[in-house]
Amino acid sequence: MHIALDVDGVLADLAGMIIKVYREETGVTIDRSMITEWEFWHKLSMTRQQFMDMIVRAWSRWIEIQPLEHDLSEDVEALSKVGVVDILTQRPVQTIDFVKQWLKHHNIRYRSFTWVPLKTSKATFVYDVYIDDSPRLAEKLQNTNRLMFLYEQPWNRNVNSRSNIIRVKSLDEVVERLACL
């Protein structure tokens, strides 16, 4: 079984860091509950490019980005026992080295690291299982035979579960569900 594991919003709390950087740069505090859509930068009156630049600034401070779960290393190791785990991540190219440092710092082991350019869909990379928070990826995969574990986040709450799109709140839950397959 080949497993594609996302970073932002699944392993790393990029949203928390974006909130912090935005507050530092503008003096305006936003709450995580405001992030109810994938393109939430519109609510901040930002362009896509301005938001991508903010992501680069956030990841340049990678040591400050918190993991979303306290036992990530163990969870990814458990995933590796049920399949081959690859990191499949879509991001500005300038953040790749920062992300790799973050993964190493948190002792997250994986077989390969695949960067997906911003204009490309992760769905073009064929895996048996995807663990991701993207509502766009869920939309692309909904009529396929590929399984997606949609990591629960405020920006994907409007995605309906389907037979192959399963909502999860933790990587532990993914491991449990995969063990039953």
How would you describe each model-predicted region?
Residues 113-116, 165-173:
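Short acidic-hydrophobic, aromatic-tinged amphipathic segments that line or gate anion-handling sites
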Residues 131-169:
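Acidic, Mg2+-coordinating phosphoryl-transfer loop and its flanking beta/alpha structural elements
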Residues 90-142:
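Substrate-recognition "cap/lid" segment bordering the active-site pocket of phosphatases
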Residues 1-51:
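Active-site neighborhood of HAD-like aspartate-dependent phosphohydrolases
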Residues 121-124, 173-181:
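Short amphipathic alpha-helix with an adjacent loop that forms part of the alpha/beta core around
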Residues 57-87, 92-100:
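Short, acidic loop-to-helix structural element flanking the phosphoryl-transfer center
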